[in-house]
C-alpha cells in the first residue's frame, strides 16, 4: 500500500476516518523509502523502530481532528538534532553522534504528533551545492540519476521528489533549501531569518542559517511551516513574531499585486532557456492580475563574494568545537593534545569543509580582517538596502532559483568557484534575512526549473498566496519523475 500520492489533507481525512492508522501510514512510508533508496540515496539513517512505536502511541491516543499533522511522518536533514537518532551532519567527524536533545523545530513537530521517519543525506556540515561532499554517499536527482539533487539539503529534496516522504525539513544558509527544491521540481521555503528557531541546528553560518520545509505543494509547505515557526527563548536570534496561519492567504487572488523582476536575475550566467521560462512565468502572473516590472538590484552581483567571506568566517568559528575531545570522531594516532586537535580535524573533516575553515580563518586574521570580513559586512548592508528600495514599491520579487537546471554528478565538485556560482540567485536572500520560496515552473531539457519568489521580512503569507495562485494555473507540481510513478 503506497500513500505517497495523497496530500496532507487527504491523509488527515483517511486517518480521522480510521481507513488507515498512523502505524499503517508510517509502515507504508518506510516501504516507499526502502523501495527507492537504492536508486536515489536520500537517507543516512532510518528511525524505523522509533517511528513505528511513536505511531502506535498516536493511534492509542487517537488522531486530533483539529491537527492536520497528527500522525504524519516526515524526514529531517541530518544537521538538525534528534534525540536518540544519529545526527551526523554527513561528516566523519560526527559519524556516531547521537544527540541527547531535540532541536526546537523537532520538539514543535512532536508536539503536533508528527513522526520523524529518518535523517537525510546532505553536503558535509551543509557546505556544498550538490550533496556530493557527504562522508556517507552521493544522493542522486529524482528526475535523472546521473544528475545532482542540489545541495546542501539534497537528501531532503530527493526524498520528497521521489515519493519516499510527503514532507521534509532542510536548512538554508545560501540556497540549500531552494536550489535542491528547484533541481527536483518541488516546493522549498527559506523563511525570514529568525522565524524558525536555530536551537539544535548544527551551526554553519549563524547570521545566515534558517530551517525550512520541503513539500510537493505550496499548501503542504505552509502547513509544515505552521508547525515549526515561532519564537524560542533558546535561540537569541529568534524573532518575537506572532505565528500567523501561513495557509490563510492561499486561494486568494493576486489582482493588483506589484511584482518586481530584477534585470540582474536574467543576465550574465543565466541559461537562456531558464530566462525564457521565467519570462513565461512573469506573463502568467500578469494574467492573474498582478503587474510585473523590471527593477535593478545593483549590488546583488557581489553576493557570492560577500557570502563566501561571511559564511566561511562564521563556519571557522562554529566548527572550532569539533576537536575530538567531547564528542564525535577522535584520531587514534594522536599522542599529544596538539596531535589530537590537528589529526582529528585533518582526518574528520572533508576537503570542502577544510577549504572553508581556512578561507574563514584567513578572512578573520588580524592583517586581513578590515579588507575582507569588515568590507564584506559593508557590502552586505548595500545588498540589504537594494532590497529595501525595491520593497518600498513592490510586494514581491520573482526570478529563477538557479542559473541552470541540475548539473551532472562529478562535474563541478572539483571546481569550487563554479559550484559557488550556482548559488548566485539564492545567496542575496540569506544575506538580507528575507523569506524566499522555490516552486516548480516547468522543464528545460527534461529537468525541472524552479521559480523563486522573494518577499520583505515576515511576508511568508503573501509569498504563499502568490505561489499558490501560480501553482493553481499550472500542472508542474503534479508531474512526477519515473521513480515516483510519473512518465518523465
Curated annotation (Swiss-Prot):
Q: What biological function has been recorded for the protein in this entry? A: Allows the formation of correctly charged Gln-tRNA(Gln) through the transamidation of misacylated Glu-tRNA(Gln) in organisms which lack glutaminyl-tRNA synthetase. The reaction takes place in the presence of glutamine and ATP through an activated gamma-phospho-Glu-tRNA(Gln).
Query: Gene behind this chain?
Result: gatA
The first-level EC class reads: ligase
> Is this entry keyworded Protein biosynthesis?
yes
List the GO terms this entry assigns under cellular component, sorted alphabetically. glutamyl-tRNA(Gln) amidotransferase complex
Entry similarity comment: Belongs to the amidase family. GatA subfamily.
- Name the UniProt record assigns to this protein: Glutamyl-tRNA(Gln) amidotransferase subunit A
The record's annotation in PANTHER family points to: GLUTAMYL-TRNA(GLN) AMIDOTRANSFERASE SUBUNIT A, TRANSAMIDASE
Print the keywords alphabetically: ATP-binding, Ligase, Nucleotide-binding, Protein biosynthesis
Active site positions: 77 (charge relay system), 152 (charge relay system), 176 (acyl-ester intermediate)
Note the subunit structure: Heterotrimer of A, B and C subunits.
Catalysed reaction equations from the record:
L-glutamyl-tRNA(Gln) + L-glutamine + ATP + H2O = L-glutaminyl-tRNA(Gln) + L-glutamate + ADP + phosphate + H(+)
Per the UniProt entry, what is one GO biological process? translation
Q: Which domain of life is it from?
A: Bacteria
Under InterPro entries, the record lists: Amidase (IPR000120), Amidase_CS (IPR020556), Amidase_dom (IPR023631), AS_sf (IPR036928), GatA (IPR004412)
Q: What is its EC number?
A: 6.3.5.7
Amino acid at each position: 500500500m503506497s500513500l505517497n500520492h495523497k496530500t496532507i489533507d487527504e491523509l488527515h481525512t483517511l486517518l480521522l476516518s480510521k481507513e488507515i492508522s498512523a502505524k499503517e501510514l508510517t509502515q507504508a512510508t518506510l516501504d516507499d523509502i526502502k523501495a527507492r533508496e537504492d536508486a536515489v540515496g536520500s537517507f543516512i539513517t532510518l528511525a524505523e523502530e522509533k517511528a513505528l512505536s511513536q505511531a502506535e502511541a498516536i493511534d492509542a491516543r487517537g488522531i486530533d481532528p483539529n491537527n492536520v499533522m497528527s500522525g504524519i511522518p516526515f524526514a529531517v536533514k541530518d544537521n538538525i538534532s534528534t534525540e536518540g537518532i544519529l545526527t551526523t551532519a554527513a561528516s566523519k567527524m560526527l559519524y556516531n553522534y547521537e544527540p541527547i536533545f531535540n532541536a526546537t523545530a523537532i520538539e514543535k513537530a512532536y508536539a503536533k504528533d508528527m513522526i520523524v521517519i529518518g535523517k537525510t543525506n546532505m553536503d558535509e556540515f551543509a557546505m556544498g551545492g550538490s550533496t556530493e561532499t557527504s562522508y556517507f554517499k552521493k544522493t542522486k536527482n529524482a528526475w535523472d540519476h546521473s544528475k545532482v539533487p542540489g545541495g546542501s539539503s539534497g537528501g531532503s529534496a530527493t526524498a520528497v521528489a521521489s515519493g519516499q516522504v510527503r514532507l521534509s525539513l532542510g536548512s538554508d544558509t545560501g540556497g540549500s533549501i531552494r536550489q535542491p527544491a528547484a533541481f527536483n521540481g518541488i516546493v522549498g521555503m527559506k523563511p525570514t531569518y529568525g522565524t524558525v528557531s536555530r536551537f539544535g541546528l548544527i551551526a554553519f553560518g549563524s547570521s545566515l542559517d534558517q530551517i525550512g520545509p520541503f513539500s510537493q505543494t505550496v499548501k503542504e509547505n505552509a502547513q509544515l511551516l505552521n508547525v515549526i515557526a515561532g519564537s524560542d527563548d533558546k535561540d537569541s536570534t529568534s524573532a518575537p513574531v506572532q505565528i500567523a496561519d501561513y495557509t490563510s492567504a492561499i486561494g486568494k487572488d493576486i489582482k493588483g499585486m506589484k511584482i518586481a523582476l530584477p534585470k540582474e536575475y536574467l543576465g550574465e550566467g543565466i541559461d537562456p532557456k531558464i530566462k525564457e521560462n521565467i519570462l513565461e512565468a512573469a506573463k502568467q502572473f500578469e494574467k492573474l492580475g498582478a503587474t510585473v516590472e523590471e527593477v535593478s538590484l545593483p549590488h546583488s552581483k557581489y553576493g557570492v563574494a560577500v557570502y563566501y567571506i561571511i559564511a566561511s568566517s562564521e563556519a571557522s568559528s562554529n566548527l572550532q568545537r569539533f576537536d575530538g575531545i567531547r564528542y564525535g570522531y577522535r584520531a587514534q594516532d594522536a599522542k599529544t593534545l596538539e596531535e589530537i586537535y590537528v589529526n582529528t580535524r585533518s582526518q574528520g573533516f572533508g576537503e570542502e569543509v577544510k577549504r572553508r575553515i581556512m578561507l574563514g580563518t584567513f578572512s578573520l586574521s588580524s592583517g586581513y580582517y578590515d579588507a575582507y570580513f569588515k568590507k564584506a559586512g559593508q557590502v552586505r548592508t548595500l545588498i540589504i538596502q537594494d532590497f529595501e528600495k525595491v520593497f518600498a514599491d513592490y510586494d514581491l520579487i520573482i526570478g529563477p532559483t538557479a542559473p541552470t537546471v541540475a548539473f551532472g554528478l562529478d562535474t563541478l565538485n572539483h571546481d569550487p568557484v563554479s559550484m559557488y556560482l550556482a548559488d548566485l540567485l539564492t545567496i542575496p536572500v540569506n544575506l538580507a534575512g528575507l523569506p524566499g520560496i522555490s516552486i516548480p515552473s516547468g522543464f528545460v531539457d527534461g529537468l525541472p526549473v524552479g521559480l523563486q519568489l522573494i518577499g520583505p521580512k515576515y511576508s511568508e503569507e503573501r509569498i504563499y498566496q502568490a505561489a499558490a495562485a501560480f501553482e493553481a494555473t499550472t500542472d508542474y507540481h503534479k508531474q512526477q519523475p519515473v521513480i515516483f510513478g510519473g512518465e518523465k
